[in-house]
Design a protein with these regions (language model features):
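Conserved, well-structured ligand/cofactor-binding cores
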Residues: 9-222
């Protein structure tokens, strides 16, 4: 039986370590700072439920408030109400901000090849949740909660194994990861282990697809 080495983790972080052979799902708390490789291996098994620490949730909310303040003020800020790359100086009208974020994800779904295994993709999703829990991205608590809910329901997007160089974040893999959470594209069915439509699988597992608001598409992939 594989067992984890002793790890010195503050009790306040509420980490409860179990062997990978345990059938009981334990809740593990992430905060963007204390995740270990051992935790990540655990999360790959699908036997753990994720949540953020209260402090991490507060940080996420505070970060989103900054984004909202920028939107309310009409201030121009890159990635919030502008285009990207060569279009960074193009100001996007408020009524187009959500579709901009959706299209950012769709346009970067350029991966090819055999899909990553479910275990590896679980780790990818857990890593993204951990990064977002730092409270630096501007994602809303509502969107992040839906991402966490999908992980806990084992609704895992299908992510191709090839198609990125990792130059500015792993844009293609993370876009495929986000696309499934939007209820689009393919997803692993937690009941059968087969690939199906994300919209159907999320609905059957009572998961609400994420609806990206200003800045949130960028937060999901960069």
């Amino acid at each position: 039986m594989y067992s984890l080495p002793h790890l010195s983790i503050p009790v306040s972080h509420k980490f409860i370590f179990e062997s990978l052979m345990s059938n009981q799902r334990q809740t593990q708390y992430v905060d963007g700072n204390t995740l270990t490789v051992e935790n990540l291996v655990q999360f790959s098994t699908g036997k753990f439920i994720l949540n953020l620490t209260p402090a991490a949730w507060a940080g996420v909310a505070a970060s989103r408030k900054i984004v909202q303040n920028i939107l309310d003020s009409g201030e121009v800020a890159y990635g919030i109400n502008t285009g990207f790359g060569l279009f960074s100086k193009v100001v996007i009208s408020p009524d187009k901000l959500e579709i901009l974020q959706d299209n950012l994800i769709r346009s970067h779904c350029a991966g090819v090849g055999t899909p990553l295994t479910r275990n590896r993709t679980r780790m990818l999703l857990a890593l993204r949740i951990n990064v977002l829990s730092k409270g630096h991205s501007g994602i809303s608590t509502l969107t992040l909660q839906r991402v966490v809910n999908a992980f806990n329901a084992d609704c895992i997007s299908v992510v191709p194994s090839q198609g990125t160089v990792g130059a500015s974040g792993d844009l293609a893999p993370l876009s495929h990861l986000a696309l499934g959470l939007m209820g689009e594209g393919p997803m692993w069915d937690p009941e059968t282990g087969q690939i199906g439509e994300a919209s159907d699988i999320m609905k059957r597992n009572k998961c609400v697809p994420i609806k990206l608001k200003a800045k949130e598409g960028l937060a999901m992939i960069n």
